[in-house]
Structures are given as structure tokens and as C-alpha cells.
């Protein structure tokens, strides 16, 4: 499997245990040579990788580079990242979706979890708020060649009104406003998220 932009490694901690004995796990973070946020993320992630033998077999590639050989991967996963890839409309997201399609075997799966925006939210507002419309991702995937295989409401949250001063980062776990209305945002909980499964024909 490939995990796109693993951040600080929350899902890596789970996935590495499943893949250690009989699997191949490729993590594809931002290249730290980009500096700034990418470098800080890599510092945190590389510290995790060095903390336990369970991470010793993880292979590293980078977003926008060649993640793996074409048609060599069974599944690609991304969790709450697509809003970061639409700062220029959809150019970066298209590149990553195409790279994902290319590395997957026929019949392979692309799993997506993302903060869910209200219908008809503009791309500009999606980028600012961190919420992305379900249709935007489905259309992007279909344009790349994927078929929507399944979807789940396991990560849905009907309390999430999606109209906060600091976007999705107002809610936990970020709590960007710190103590301001903290109990209110803790009561809402984490964001309403779509969970989509695409397949390469």
C-alpha cells in the first residue's frame, strides 16, 4: 500500500502493524527539501519512524515524485489531505490522482477520507476552510479513470455546521481558537467526513 501525505503518522502507527510481516508499506510525504511546513512535518514523521522497529520496513517516496513502479500497488490511502492540494484550483490534486492511478494495479483501490463541505462550495472556499465537497472528489477521481466502488458514513458528524472562524481547524483536534468557545467546539467534536472507495478498472 501507499499512504499519501502521512502527516505526523497517526495512521502510520496503525497501518505499519498490519504490513510489517507480509506487506509492503510506502509512505509518500512532502519532500522536506521544500522547506517550511514540509520540513517540519518530515522532522516529526522521521522521529516516529526511528522510534520503533515496527516502522523499519517502511519505504519513503515523495508526493509529486514517482511513488512506486506503475501497476505495482494494491491500495493507496489518503486521510484528510485533499484540501491541501487545491491551492491552485485542482492542478496539484489532478497530478496526485493521476500518479495514484498509475501505480495501482488493475482492480486496485484508492481510499479517501476528507472533511466534507456543503454542496456547491467553491474551490477557493474549500481551500480556505479545509472542507471539500464530495462531488468535487468524485468528479476528479472519475476524470482520472477511477470508478466509485463504495462510500461510508462511518466518519459522518451531523453536529458539524462547517462555518467556523478558522475553518475546520476550529474543531478538535486542532482547536485553533484555543480557549475561545472551547467547550462548544469539543461538544461538536471532529469534522463531518466523507469516506470514499474508488477502484481502478
What are these regions (language model features)?
Residues 8-67:
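Class I SAM-dependent methyltransferase SAM/SAH-binding core
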Residues 17, 92-106:
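A short glycine-rich, Lys/Arg-flanked "PGG" loop and its adjoining helix->strand segment in the class I
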Amino acid at each position: 500500500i501507499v499512504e499519501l501525505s502521512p502527516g505526523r503518522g497517526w495512521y502510520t502507527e496503525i497501518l505499519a502493524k498490519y504490513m510489517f510481516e507480509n506487506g509492503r508499506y510506502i509512505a509518500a510525504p512532502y519532500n522536506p527539501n521544500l522547506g517550511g511546513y514540509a520540513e517540519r512535518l518530515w522532522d516529526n514523521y522521521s522521529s516516529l519512524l526511528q522510534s520503533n522497529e515496527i516502522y523499519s520496513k517502511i519505504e519513503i517516496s515523495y508526493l509529486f515524485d514517482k511513488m512506486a513502479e506503475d501497476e505495482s500497488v494494491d491500495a493507496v490511502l489518503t486521510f484528510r489531505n485533499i484540501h491541501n492540494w487545491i491551492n491552485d484550483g485542482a492542478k496539484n490534486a489532478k497530478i496526485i490522482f493521476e500518479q495514484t492511478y498509475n501505480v495501482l494495479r488493475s482492480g486496485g483501490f484508492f481510499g479517501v477520507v476528507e472533511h466534507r463541505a456543503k454542496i456547491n462550495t467553491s474551490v477557493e472556499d474549500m481551500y480556505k476552510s479545509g472542507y471539500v465537497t464530495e462531488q468535487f472528489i468524485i468528479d476528479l477521481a472519475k476524470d482520472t479513470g477511477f470508478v466509485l466502488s463504495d462510500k461510508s458514513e462511518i466518519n459522518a458528524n451531523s453536529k458539524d455546521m462547517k462555518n467556523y472562524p478558522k475553518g475546520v481547524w476550529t474543531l478538535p483536534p486542532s482547536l485553533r481558537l484555543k480557549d475561545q468557545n472551547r467547550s462548544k467546539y469539543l461538544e461538536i467534536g471532529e469534522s463531518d467526513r466523507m469516506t470514499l472507495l474508488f477502484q481502478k478498472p
